Amino acid sequence: MELKLLNDQGAQSATLQASDALFGRDYNEALIHQVVVAYMANARSGNRAQKGRAEVSKSTRKPWRQKGTGRARAGMASSPLWRGGGRVFPNSPEDNFSQKLNRKMYRAGVASILSQLAREDRLAIVENFSVEAPKTRLLSQKLKGMGLDSVLVITDEFDENLFLSSRNLHKVLVLEVSETDPVSLVHYDRVIVTKGALAKMEEAWQ
């Protein structure tokens, strides 16, 4: 699979031969959906909680006698039928949202995403991607000069200047290869990969 090599102006300067195992796969929508949903489900913190009828702070005394008042029978104020009562099926922090996804499926899903990005010309390679100082303005100008707006930048190693410069740009995300995930790959309009990161991706995900 041939990928575009961009210069600092965002124009194609050459092409690179990349692994077909990573960038030449067929588009598998069902697998991509499963990988993305599983990743998001496994990232949930599981902190939502509600109270059931046994947990709300209400008296357990019977509000009125069973028969003879003409009113509907009632057992206790914590009943889900009453205002302020407990929920019937309360959410719990112990709810388990995790989904099992084996490594082979995960890698195949990521490769399918990368292949589709390459086919749609939304993925490109750069020799190097950096800024001279940790300033948002410098990175914003660099991206504007390359014609990029919503972009994921994948680097081979941590670049503090680049990372700090990107934190205030909500349409820009900078990740190392080891941090790259399927949700980020499908979220941004363009994906820029450094040559060093490309080599690491081919080594890790094939």
Swiss-Prot record:
InterPro entries xrefs: Ribosomal_uL4 (IPR002136), Ribosomal_uL4-like (IPR013005), Ribosomal_uL4_dom_sf (IPR023574)
Gene Ontology annotations of biological process type: translation
Swiss-Prot/TrEMBL keywords: Ribonucleoprotein, Ribosomal protein, RNA-binding, rRNA-binding
GO cellular component, one term: ribosome
Signal sequence residues: none
UniProt GO MF annotations: rRNA binding; structural constituent of ribosome
Region annotation Disordered: where it falls in the sequence: 47-94
Comp. bias regions, Basic residues: 59-70
Annotated family: Belongs to the universal ribosomal protein uL4 family.
HAMAP family: Ribosomal_uL4_B
Function: One of the primary rRNA binding proteins, this protein initially binds near the 5'-end of the 23S rRNA. It is important during the early stages of 50S assembly. It makes multiple contacts with different domains of the 23S rRNA in the assembled 50S subunit and ribosome. Forms part of the polypeptide exit tunnel.
Subunit field text: Part of the 50S ribosomal subunit.
Name assigned to this protein: Large ribosomal subunit protein uL4
Organism listed in the record: Aromatoleum aromaticum (strain DSM 19018 / LMG 30748 / EbN1) (Azoarcus sp. (strain EbN1))
Name of encoding gene: rplD
